[in-house]
From Swiss-Prot:
Pfam families: MoaC. The lineage of its organism: Archaea, Methanobacteriati, Methanobacteriota, Thermococci, Thermococcales. GO terms for molecular function: cyclic pyranopterin monophosphate synthase activity; GTP 3',8'-cyclase activity. It is an enzyme of class 4 (lyase). Substrate binds at L75, C76, H77, M111, E112. This is Probable cyclic pyranopterin monophosphate synthase. Its EC number is 4.6.1.17.
Length: 159
């Protein structure tokens, strides 16, 4: 281990050995926010975005991202996920996305939750590009921000 990093030693980069760990209930919750024009948030709530159902698309994208996290983050272990929930809270000029991931396994699921929330936010951006662009084709208001883990659980039961 180099400087307290579990993925690096004197031989280089490695995937951490977890074979000796017990299988326990794991949960992680991550949140993030996309700032949008108030008019865009209203259109999403009313289901009037021409490209399609923004929230359903974001949910599917987030769930797929959770399942593919070890393909995107090189040193993540493939984890048998037991459940994923992607939910939304609305403000006047933003949508906050929450991704909750659950599993019974030997290592945590926080990277999966972070990946899920980030890709869900990116999917929202993709779905609303046409209404968020200004006259020069730029996105002066649109921002993805504050992606973070809000809860991490490790317990020998699911409560």
């Amino acid at each position: 281990m180099v400087g307290g990093l579990t993925h690096v030693d004197e031989k280089g980069v490695k995937m951490v050995e977890i074979g000796y760990k017990d299988v326990v209930f794991r949960k992680a919750v991550a949140k993030g926010r996309i700032k949008l024009k108030p008019e865009t948030v209203k259109l999403i709530k009313e289901g009037k975005i021409e490209k399609g159902n923004v929230l359903a698309t974001a949910q599917i994208a987030g769930i797929l991202a959770v399942k593919r996290t070890p393909e995107l983050i090189p040193l993540c272990h493939p984890i048998p996920i037991t459940g994923v929930d992607i939910t939304f809270d609305f403000g006047e000029d933003y949508i906050e996305v929450t991704c909750e991931v659950r599993a019974y396994y030997k290592t945590g699921v926080e990277m999966e939750a972070l990946t899920g929330v980030t890709v869900a936010l990116l999917a929202i951006w993709d779905m609303v590009k046409a209404v968020e662009k200004d006259e020069k084709g730029q996105y002066p208001y649109t921002r993805i921000e504050n992606v973070h883990v809000v809860e991490k659980v490790k317990t020998h039961n699911s409560q």
